């Protein structure tokens, strides 16, 4: 087992990893930028190393600084969390070269699944249902036109190196294809340094349902049930739940088997997520695979009583998994609390938290790194907390969430708490009748 793990991240996920390491008797090293000197992960770790100024590309994305921090503290493994370098094949490779275990996917796997067109081709070989569309990357606009005609409108252009909704364009008719092709490629080039595109049939008003998997170094994989991530704004998830209100026992079995088949086909090692689009007829199609821990992993932990971070560490240390699949025994909901103003287009709201009262009680979990007096820097992602409620039924979990949101007081900055309060009262949400298009029609109402 590892003696010391460096956590190459910040915020709540860094704190989350540190807590599990402490429970396992593993020493921890925090890294931080100048802007994060007062962050809780720095205070809770056994050691802490400043790796640069506030800008991410000079600190949390600076591979040489992170490797140097690992070497001077004699860390024998690095946990990348999510975001930043968690799906960076070069970072994974450099860790290998320095004799440091990367607690995540291999560089080859990150490359293979990170290229969306390649990932889709691989899933087809594994026998996993995929959305109809191009066979790999589209080289020219002429090929793009022919593929769209063959696939049938509407279609979706997607960046092969994409993520977070960047480089994606829905095209409803052929007259709009050229503009979409040009703008998607430009956006992809700017965001990822790569303008490769592929095309899929546009699945109208789908649900986005992901399957959590774990694979070990002995060729075995298992799934830990699903998460419904359909409520999104600009392809960014806002809230998630498990089980999905749209799920049936038969569909869960099929999707779980497909995810395990995919993982074992590629000999996947570590925690990962296979994301699917599910249409109104409950047909499901492979969307992408995330080769890291997900933001929303706590709701899975809550319903199956399982520490995913601990399992990641054990698998990285060569421990075999049990190989059994896990099914949800309860219902869990997560609301992402962001430092944003929901009444002003979700504009970021960095600044100093003057007052903070955390919710509590049975079935309430709060994953956060903020506290009263903490200043939220403008340099990073705006998520400051994850509020999770768990109960025997979905109705009870919603009631718990409403109560917890009412208890949650953050002053000094704007947050998305008012949005989540209104979401929990929305008839379509209460009915479980929502798709990825839900936010297009959602209007947040002013409060007194």
Q: Over which residues does each language-model region extend?
A:
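ATP-binding N-terminal substructure of ATP-dependent carboxylate-amine bond-forming enzymes
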Residues: 1-126, 138-146, 396
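ATP-dependent carboxylate activation and anion-phosphoryl transfer catalytic cores
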Residues: 7-23, 48, 71-73, 104, ...
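Structural detector of well-ordered beta-strand residues that form the stable sheet scaffold
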Residues: 29, 79, 101-103, 131, ...
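Short secondary-structure boundary/hinge segments and terminal tails
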Residues: 38-39, 87-88, 113, 140-142, ...
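Methionine-biased hydrophobic packing positions in alpha-helices, especially
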Residues: 110-113, 123, 156, 168, ...
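A polyampholytic, Gly/Pro-enriched intrinsically disordered region
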Residues: 122-131, 152-154
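Catalytic beta/alpha-barrel core
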Residues: 134
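Acidic/histidine-enriched active-site and ligand-binding environments that engage anionic O-linkages
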Residues: 146-156
